[in-house]
Amino acid sequence: MAAVVLVTAALIICQIFPVKAADDENLYALSAVLMDGENGRVLYGKEAYKGRPNASTTKVMTCILALELAKGDDYVQVSGNAASQPQTRLGMREGQQFYLEDLLYSLMLKSHNDSAVAIAEHIGGSVEGFAEKMNEKAKELGCKDTHFVTPNGLDGEDEGGIHHTTARDLALIMAYAIKNATFVHITQTRDYTFTDISGKKHYSVHNTNAFLDMETGVISGKTGFTGNAGYCYVCAVRQDERLFIVALLGCGWPGNKNYKWSDTKKLLSYGRENYQYVMLPEFPQLPEILVTEAAPGKEDPYPQKSDHSGYPPKQVMLKIHAVLSEKDRGKRYLLKKTETITWETELPDKLPAPIQKNQKIGTLHAKLNGKELLSCLVTADDKIDRITYKWYVDKVFKDYFH
């Protein structure tokens, strides 16, 4: 039966000033999340996992998919469906053609609904086809309760349910999107002008993300509003090397347009005053594992228990080590002063030979507040052969006939 050993590694964390925690009552949003943008850990959540309509914050997914699945110089043909989308819209006409890159600025700066549909139909063949790609990507990113029906965030419903996401999932999507430099460049642009491919129609769009100029370190952001969703907002901010993602759903209705800025500032302040990055602690010292029915190696490297019979014992001790995957090396986490990461090693009491070098022996789990952050393999340092009848025959022949 596996023996579970808990080893707590003390972490030295920079001093930070204690502040009052972000209380649900202090936020206007129905759902809110403050996330560690480097690893997706939720630092604060208010109904973080409750599904809600998310309006034009949907366009974060539309944009990142377009950047990954198409080229900026693609010709996008406008359909009647795209041209008939409600406000806010660019005002494109059926049959017009645009470069995809220009429509991405229209999509993310001014949040044009017709541009979203034109992009979706170009890439997915239809709105429905593009929605399938959106939902596939959401699952790939680890979203737990997200279902996309429309590329612009307008209310929609299909056999999979209504168009919705959660504050946690929305933050996760933004954390992924900002890894794309072109996405960041587009969403940081204040003003952009372009024409259709014919060059006859000129357009100018201004970024509606006013938060770009309210705080230092804003990397990206997207606003949204429908009568059903209320005001929504998601942004990424890096301050003092700390990467925060804020996601807000249902943050007020007309007359309270600035609630989203207030909530975002509160959450960022809470993050700055309570969290500092720390690296993973050192691995704990791992025990040696008893290996039964083992034959010694050529140099007999293992400590053995002699039975004075002239033959080797059948038990040796195996040294083991933990290995972090390449993707987990250098990971760090935003922690409060009172938080520590613990290592939990899951290892067998003993194993039978043979054992191969670098064979998996167990697992080492990094946990915080009882939740797993990551896991890594524990492997064998050396090879151990199994002692067999042939080994005994060879031993006798060597000892008595040579």
Predicted regions, residues:
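Active-site-adjacent loops and short helices of periplasmic peptidoglycan-processing enzymes
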Residues: 16-181, 198
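Short, ordered coil/turn segments that flank beta-strands lining enzyme active or ligand-binding pockets
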Residues: 1, 19, 37-38, 239, ...
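Domain-terminus/edge residues, biased toward the C-terminal soluble/receptor-binding domains
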Residues: 161-402
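Sec-dependent N-terminal signal peptides of Gram-positive bacterial secreted proteins and lipoproteins
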Residues: 1-20
